[in-house]
Design a protein with these regions (language model features):
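Gly/Ser/Thr-rich phosphate-binding loop
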Residues: 2-3, 20, 28-33, 42-109, ...
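ATP-dependent adenylate-forming carboxylate-activation enzymes
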Residues: 4-22
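Hydrophobic alpha-helical scaffolding
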Residues: 9-13, 26-31, 61-65, 112-113, ...
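Nucleotide phosphate-binding site architecture
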Residues: 12, 38-39, 151, 162
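Short, P/G- and charge-enriched loop/turn segments at secondary-structure junctions
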Residues: 106-113, 164
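Conserved ATP/PPi-binding loop(s) of AMP-dependent carboxylate-activating enzymes
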Residues: 116-120, 131-166
Length: 167
């Protein structure tokens, strides 16, 4: 099994070391937070991070919004000490699971990029008219086919599912 530590509140109260205190005290192996928190903490004195033992960390992660390259590097360099894979994930509540993310120790990491679709996910980038974009062209993200965590019915009441979500 695994122990989960759930953190409540803001990362800067009562001190800007709050995250790092929790990691040190509980010997956290995987730490997952939002880029907004990272950007906020990166503005503070580096001692807030440096004064704590974070060597228990094996993987650090980012979730909730795109992470910019500057925040990615600060998180990787000062929290992960350039030794922990930084898993930048993309998903939405509606998708039911992470859809695009690197595989720690396998995928080459790219600052500010969630990298590759996970197994069973077929993303497409399309224009407004739903034609597939050319490489390097901006567009909207679509998922081509149903994915493993997609809700496709309500157990024992498919009509309710259709009426609630599609009609």
């Amino acid at each position: 099994g695994a122990t989960t530590v759930i953190f409540e509140g803001i990362p800067s109260y009562p001190t800007h070391s709050r995250f790092w205190e929790v990691i040190q005290k509980h010997r956290v192996n995987q730490f997952y937070t939002a880029p907004t928190a990272i950007r906020s903490l990166a503005k503070e004195k580096i001692e807030y991070v440096r004064d704590y033992r974070l060597d228990s960390l094996k993987v650090i992660g980012s979730v909730g919004e795109p992470i910019n390259e500057e925040a990615w590097h600060w998180y990787n360099d000062h929290v992960g000490n350039k030794r922990c894979p930084l898993v930048d994930t993309w998903w939405q509540t509606e998708t039911g699971s992470i859809m695009i993310a690197p595989l720690p120790g396998v995928t080459t990491l790219k600052p500010g990029c969630a990298t590759n679709p996970l197994f069973g996910i077929e993303p497409l980038v399309c224009l407004e008219d739903r034609t597939v974009c050319k490489p390097g062209e901006d567009g909207r993200l679509f998922i081509k086919k149903p994915w493993p965590s997609q809700a496709r019915t309500i157990w024992g009441d498919h009509q309710r599912y259709m009426d609630t979500y599609w009609n």
